[in-house]
From Swiss-Prot:
Keyword list, A-Z: Cellulose biosynthesis, Repeat, Signal, TPR repeat
GO biological process, one term: cellulose biosynthetic process
Pathway: Glycan metabolism; bacterial cellulose biosynthesis
Gene3D superfamilies, per the entry: Tetratricopeptide repeat domain
Family stated for the protein in its record: Belongs to the AcsC/BcsC family.
TPR repeats: 62-95, 266-299, 300-333, 348-381, 382-415, 458-491, 600-633, 707-741
Protein name per the record: Putative cellulose synthase operon protein C
Keyword match Signal: yes
Amino acid sequence: MRKFTLNIFTLSLGLAVMPMVEAAPTAQQQLLEQVRLGEATHREDLVQQSLYRLELIDPNNPDVVAARFRSLLRQGDIDGAQKQLDRLSQLAPSSNAYKSSRTTMLLSTPDGRQALQQARLQATTGHAEEAVANLFNGAPPEGDIAVEYWSTVAKIPARRGEAINQLKRINADEPGNTGLQNNLALLLFSSDRRDEGFAVLEQMAKSNAGREGASKIWYGQIKDMPVSDASVSALKKYLSIFSDGDSVAAAQSQLAEQQKQLADPAFRARAQGLAAVDSGMAGKAIPELQQAVRANPKDSEALGALGQAYSQKGDRANAVANLEKALALDPHSSNNDKWNSLLKVNRYWLAIQQGDAALKANNPDRAERLFQQARNVDNTDSYAVLGLGDVAMARKDYPAAERYYQQTLRMDSGNTNAVRGLANIYRQQSPEKAEAFIASLSASQRRSIDDIERSLQNDRLAQQAEALENQGKWAQAAALQRQRLALDPGSVWITYRLSQDLWQAGQRSQADTLMRNLAQQKPNDPEQVYAYGLYLSGHDQDRAALAHINSLPRAQWSSNIQELVNRLQSDQVLETANRLRESGKEAEAEAMLRQQPPSTRIDLTLADWALQRRDYTAARAAYQNVLTREPTNADAILGLTEVDIAAGDTAAARSQLAKLPATDNASLNTQRRVALAQAQLGDTAAAQQTFNKLIPQAKSQPPSMESAMVLRDGAKFEAQAGDPKQALETYKDAMVASGVTTTRPQDNDTFTRLTRNDEKDDWLKRGVRSDAADLYRQQDLNVTLEHDYWGSSGTGGYSDLKAHTTMLQVDAPYSDGRMFFRSDFVNMNVGSFSTNADGKWDDNWGTCTLRDCSGNRSQSDSGASVAVGWRNDVWSWDIGTTPMGFNVVDVVGGISYSDDIGPLGYTVNAHRRPISSSLLAFGGQKDFPSNTGKKWGGVRADGVGLSLSYDKGEANGVWASLSGDQLTGKNVEDNWRVRWMTGYYYKVINQNNRRVTIGLNNMIWHYDKDLSGYSLGQGGYYSPQEYLSFAIPVMWRERTENWSWELGASGSWSHSRTKTMPRYPLMNLIPTDWQEEAARQSNDGGSSQGFGYTARALLERRVTSNWFVGTAIDIQQAKDYAPSHFLLYVRYSAAGWQGDMDLPPQPLIPYADW
């Protein structure tokens, strides 16, 4: 157990001693250090003793061989030294020991000594770089030569630090070299490394050889310190290290004197102030020196130091005042050179400061005088010239500013303010010139205006993005906005622009996320709140916009935010009012608006409503009310202009339009209204010029109601001005601007598909779609081929009708309407006469009741009619013929004019139309040849008509028609008629693509004579003297993407009465022999009443964009009238149509039935 304990103790002791053993130098290291010490102290005996032992221990050590080499060389044994050098080259040819030894050997030769002497001469005469280049190739030998080499290197400013480090290394290796220590200490003091210098002197003082030198250098470093606590401490430190010598005596005397002086408070304050100034502590120096000056106002040194302290603090005015006093008190002071230099500097910078202040106060004349004054003080510094450049910039004298800034840079290429000034000048001239200037700058100059370079790049990207936005290339614009955001991360408005572009590109979720993230990053930033509010309100999220704005304390709201809030709140009120008005409650909507606080916007809305309902008096009064508050309100002036135009007072309208204030900042909407007014006043050229300027502006804007309205009305104007093709292109832009689509349509199918109605559309989108569709269809070329079969039962030979009509119509654009060419081929067959037992016709036709008729019993005829015409929204006319080939052919046609009075639409027309209800009335027939053989029939209605309608798009509608006609025909008794028809309908379902109605119709007819017979002189058309009917129609109309249909039915009750009329009303047509009999014959009158019904089905299908097919069937059954129809048609669209199907389908109507 004891043995175990001893072993543990031994092991522990061993472990404890191991670090000490490892840390201790080896015998070889100790002996080598003794060699270096002996060489440094010139003790050759110490060198030889150490080498003897080293060569026994480690004879092949390169450092040992090198030491022996140096020893032999010092003894003059060149051969022995060469042998050691050769041996060293074999042992360690790459070692520092060999390289150093080889250099030392070289210096022992005459050439080497001469090269060294030459290098020393170069170093002495100030050519240190050449000396170093010629010495040793950067690898000096050891010893005094190495010290001399690195001392020479230290004379090169760029390598002084390297040289000091090398000398410190040599000092560590050769601690007794007092010459080295002397040089190193002086180098450290001159490099302002005082603490390191004193440490070297303290090391040097430990050797007898170096102590006196160290004492002199140390005292020289502290003896001239200003009297202060620091100077006393420095003297005490010196005296604690050195105890004898002349310097010590002087230090002791100086210490006693300073301690005595510092006992005086005034002197102490002065001394501490002077010391603080020397240390650069102006804040501490100023109160101390002020105290000293108060104690002795004529103390020039204190005044000068106080001026210096103020200069250090940047207080140029006080610096100048105190320095001037110091120089005046003691013009011959040893400090005069310093004070004069400081005075010049502070006078210069005082003038610069005052010039900057004058420029900031917008007083360029005073600034110019001060900068010129500074320039007179010092014409070598660049800032006075820079100031003159700033004055020229303030005066917008850019050429002069450019010259001054360029002069500034010639004086000081590092003056970044001059670089910035030139960059701003060139930026104003053109971005390209600014970029070229920046590219010419040095790296440091370029870094100084990095913000301008980024801004230029940002501006360039912004312009490129805007150009892409104008072209509708939103995704590409967004990519550029991302680059802008990378240059200016967190920018509110770049984020806003990027989000808007993404939204338009269809990346709406990403756009919303960007704006939400911005709000989270800058929750209390008013600019962010304003931008996000704009973003939300611009995408129909007004309530969300208000909620976000209200998250910011009201005290932080900017004027822009308040204006946005007012607009959004006003929008909500106006939205509610507009809904009320659109639902027919205009009075209630007006009442709600009049309850709101006074608002120009609301007053203008009320005025606009009055104008739309043609209440010009109320509209004028409302607009004048606005102008009373705001005499230059453009909307009110334009409103009065529109009132005068609507009232037909063009002179007053022109006068009002001339009152518009001239401005370059008029809104798009104001300019749009001006253009419309110009167009309505007939100033087409002016309107064209206004729209030519407006339309590109609107295209360049992000989608908005304002830009969409400009493009919509611009397209209308272009169409009216005779450029429908361009108008259609503008409608495509209007679709983007109004939000119908985010991508501009590139082909007809896409474009026309976008014209389809959408229940979610606001009034603007709905209008853009509708107007674009109307113009597109007006410009399309259509060809329609239709076959119609119709007939009604009756008496064979004249009223048992079966008719076929084949119609071909071509519609094409002309002016602002559509012209058409029409041809109908008509075949009418009224069957065959019945006969009695004798083969005679048993019918009341022609003159067969006066003389029997027999022979060919069938009656039919055919012919072709042609017609041309034109129509637009207001006028319609046509001219054509009845079927050529019939017995009676005439020219027919009509003209009509349509307009509205408020919600009441009306159409007036004048016409000449055939009566086509029978072969006799339409085409005429020919009496039996053996009787008279005369043609008669072909009845035409010449007259006028008025149609009225009231339908505001709501649930109820009313229509009415009144017409009067003169009825004439070939060999037919003249007649006239008056017809009144009216109806009411209720829309059970009233949707864009589906409508179900039920109504009540009434008809009242009156014919002067009953000429419904088929005998010679009769007309063969239904002509009761009284006719009254009531009907209840039900109609279902619907359309889908490629189908459209109408299903209808009605039940009716009618009453009619006819008078007894002569069977042969025109006796001149009857042969004389038959007239007496003819006069006795008549057609009995009478009355009847009964119920009837109708059923109708109409269907159309879009097969392709260009081809459409349709069919219809119509069955009618009523008292005295029961025609039925069946038709098929095909229509071709040259341009193609993918818009809404017609609702209901629109087959051709036989020209005879117009």
